Design a protein with these regions (language model features):
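Acidic (Asp/Glu-rich) sequence patches and key acidic residues
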Residues: 1-124, 128-131
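Short hydrophobic/aromatic patches at helix-to-coil boundaries
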Residues: 137-140
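Short secondary-structure junction motifs
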Residues: 133-135
């Protein structure tokens, strides 16, 4: 089951402030989404990088945690951010379709259109991060 997340663009040194924020999207450019979790981001990273899921999960693991109960902060790997930022619309649709067919999204009842929307929003934000030389963080 996924949770509410905030995906934001920020400088690496902002990580501590992001984890302490009650709602990062009010302080940094980004978007809020329901139903996401570390496994979904790891699966996306695995699809983009060609890594095995377990390796991708390790790379997407929490960067910071306010406590054992959360919130947690992940930094989406730079190579996935770069890949997302460079993909054209038809390629983003293909990634969304592949991601929608994974166990992580199917079990939570995500439609292909919902997954494509998530991937597109993430790619748009990845473009901002790359243009500004910043990182893409996931607060959950």
């Amino acid at each position: 089951m996924g949770m509410l997340v905030n995906v934001v663009v920020a400088d690496l040194e902002d990580a501590g402030a992001i984890i302490e924020s009650e709602k990062p999207v009010e302080e940094w450019k980004g978007f809020e989404a329901n139903g996401l979790d570390p496994a979904k981001f790891a699966m996306l990273h695995a699809l983009l990088s060609g890594e095995l899921f377990d390796e991708a999960l390790d790379e997407c693991g929490p960067l910071h945690a306010a406590s054992d109960e959360g919130p947690w902060l992940m930094n989406l790997p730079d190579d996935s951010v770069a890949h997302l930022a460079e993909l054209e619309e038809d390629a983003l649709d293909r990634v969304g379709e592949e991601l929608a067919a994974t166990e992580e999204f199917e079990e939570d009842g995500w439609s292909a259109d919902e997954v494509k929307g998530f991937v597109t929003a993430l790619a748009d934000l990845a473009g901002v991060a790359r243009a500004q030389g910043r990182a893409l963080f996931v607060w959950m």
